[in-house]
Regions:
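Cofactor-binding active-site loop characterized by glycine-rich and histidine/acidic residues
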Residues: 59-62, 66-223, 233-254, 534-536, ...
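Thiamine diphosphate
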Residues: 83-86, 150-224, 232, 259-275, ...
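Conformationally flexible catalytic loops at phosphate/diphosphate-handling active centers
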Residues: 196, 563, 569-591
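Conserved thiamine diphosphate
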Residues: 182-186, 239-271, 314-342, 511-576
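Short beta-strand segments
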Residues: 99-102, 159, 165, 169, ...
Length: 591
């Protein structure tokens, strides 16, 4: 048995179209604006467009593997078999933020169709060959991303993008409520796609759980979770019925199964999108897919699948099925589809050759340039900006300015931090402060005491007890112009969620060449514990993992006056350069 499965799958589509073209029987032509099926929202014209976008995606995968044979490409994780996600790309708007699965080729082609003049196929090829002309990552990593299409690039860390997608969905209404301008419409929704193996990860479950939790609290959460189910995690099969059993009957989460013909998938997706946009609630779209050609080009699929299993998978190729649907419905003739396929192959391979001639990053300085932007003049200017007019600031602090306070508790490190947080909330309407117990209680060490009362629950609020979700909210909020100051209650708790900093927040500017950013300050009480208490449950000195993350700033104040100045500088650094600042607060020095 030959294992050049790319050639076999390509030949199967060619064979079907040739046989159909030779057949004497042909259905009556379907008018371009007629539905593909009675009662369906998918027209013949749109179905043909979808098929063309699917063909482009498939040929990008073919080109990546062809170029790899001569060491001219560096990414062979394909979208082959997942091309029905094209329907999601076509039905969402380009100002609906999208956090995408790595098999999103067809989705991106359809999304880009909405932007005249865009060149998504060539852009993708530039990423595959690691060219510095790649408009999103400039050759640093092959990602699906685009600033004009509102697709922040994602890492391939399993499930790590679900919390921040949830965070952005939560923050849409919050920003509008606070009067913070975004570039998104009021009815925007968030798309978050992932695989069936991914959804078992604790990080994925955190994002979905927090979305449901928000609905229970009566908060808007307009997010469409799309699980692209190919029933396989590299070599490990997903048990039959697992996804439906796990997510099909959860309260506060709508579930839709998208399978069957392309028009059936279209109509199911349309209903899910309509629900999320109208109800401002989350939905879980279960999209049936098939994985062709292994996990990636380096994956020897025959080592864990029989020849019969591989052939059975290939028979379920969505392009083959969709071509048959177009021909049998009269939406397109075999000759039209053959011409479209030949033209797509020629265009994509020509573009691939052109991409290999484009420049690449040559120096370390070029590669790391967007990792840690630093503009000290701008930072100082932001930090030195007058806090408020004198009368307003005096009123904010209850008639006594913090620098003139004589009460001992106001001069402690905790007291100075409280005053500095009040100043930042007072002068920056985009600042929000949140975490476990920071609102009504005022923090377990009273550092945020009274701030919710002064600034309201829209800006100072409590979260559920999940550090991953707290950092996800911070990232999502920062993506749309808010400036989050999030609290992780103890340093010991940060390690549960550290990849949200390491793999996600700290890499966004790097992978997007500075086009996307997530400025934030993360307050973390830690180090030596308060006198009279001990044990390993809350206190932690482990900051090595933080110091190992490129681009992250770590600040550790030791005195009250330093703490206030450092916090002001941290917020200014986040605002000016989009930086992620970890602000470690020594518990033993609070009071």
């Amino acid at each position: 048995m030959t294992f050049d499965r790319v050639a076999i799958v390509e030949a199967s589509l060619d064979a079907y179209l040739s046989q159909a073209a030779a057949s004497p029987a042909s259905p009556a032509p379907l008018a371009p604006d007629a539905p593909l099926r009675e009662g369906s929202g998918l027209t013949a014209r749109k179905a043909v467009e979808l098929f063309e976008d699917q063909l482009v995606s498939r040929q990008l995968d073919v080109a990546a593997r062809e170029l790899k044979k001569t060491n001219r490409s560096f990414y062979t994780i394909s979208s082959a078999g997942h091309e029905n996600n094209v329907v999601v790309g076509a039905q969402l708007r380009i100002n609906d933020p999208a956090f995408l699965h790595y098999r999103s080729g067809a989705l991106m082609m359809a999304r880009a169709r909405q932007l005249p003049g865009s060149t998504p196929a060539f852009d993708s090829l530039l990423g595959i060959v690691a060219s510095s002309d790649d408009p999103i990552a400039q050759g640093r990593h092959k990602v699906w991303g685009s600033r004009p299409l509102w697709v922040p690039p994602q890492t391939s860390t399993i499930a790590s993008h679900l919390p921040k997608a949830m965070g952005l969905a939560f923050s849409l209404a919050r920003a509008r409520r606070l009067g913070v301008a975004t570039d998104l419409p009021d009815d925007a929704i968030v798309l978050c796609s992932f695989g069936d193996a991914t959804v078992n990860h604790a990080t994925a479950l955190a994002g979905i759980n927090t979305a449901r939790y928000a609905v229970r609290l009566g908060l808007p959460m307009p997010i469409l979770f799309v699980c692209e189910d190919n029933a396989t995690g590299i070599s490990v099969p997903t048990p039959e019925g697992w996804i439906a059993a796990s997510f099909g009957n959860l309260e506060y989460l709508r579930y839709d199964l998208a399978e069957g013909e392309i028009d059936e998938v279209w109509d199911t997706v349309a209903e899910a999108v309509r629900y999320v946009r109208g109800a401002r609630r989350p939905a879980f779209l279960h999209l049936r897919t098939v994985r062709l050609w292994g996990h990636a080009g380096s994956d020897a699929e025959q080592s864990y699948r029989s020849a019969e299993e591989i052939a059975e998978n290939e028979a379920r190729d969505p392009l083959l099925r969709n071509a048959r649907r177009l021909v049998e419905s009269g939406a397109a003739t075999p000759d039209q589809l053959q011409a479209m396929l030949a033209d797509t192959r020629e265009r994509v391979m020509a573009a691939a050759e052109e991409a290999t001639r484009r420049p690449r990053l040559e120096t370390t300085e070029e590669v790391v340039a967007p990792m840690a932007p630093y503009h000290p003049v701008g930072i100082v200017a932001r930090a030195a900006k007058p806090l408020l007019n004198p009368a307003a600031r005096l009123e904010l602090h209850g008639g006594t300015l913090p620098e003139a306070a004589l009460i001992p508790t106001a001069r402690t490190l905790a007291g100075c931090l409280n005053a500095a947080l009040a100043d930042e909330l007072g002068r920056r309407p985009e600042v929000i402060l949140f975490g476990e117990d920071v609102g009504r209680k005022g923090g377990v060490y009273n550092v945020t005491n009274g701030l919710q009362r002064r600034f309201g629950t829209g800006r100072v609020f409590d979260t559920l007890l999940d550090e991953t979700s707290i950092l996800g909210i911070a990232q999502g909020a920062a993506n749309i112009g808010l400036l989050p100051i999030a609290e992780i209650q103890y340093l010991a708790y940060l390690h549960n969620a550290l990849d949200q900093i390491r793999g996600e927040a700290a890499t966004l500017q790097f992978f997007s060449s500075g086009q996307f950013r997530n400025p934030m300050v993360v307050r973390v009480p830690g180090l030596a514990y308060q006198k009279g208490f001990g044990g390993h449950f809350h206190n932690d000195n482990s900051i090595g993992a933080l110091r190992d993350i490129p681009g992250v700033v770590v600040a550790v104040p030791a005195r009250g006056d330093d703490a206030a100045r450092m916090l002001r500088g941290a917020v200014a650094m986040a605002a000016e350069d989009g930086r992620v600042v970890i602000f470690l607060e020594p518990i033993a020095l609070y009071h």
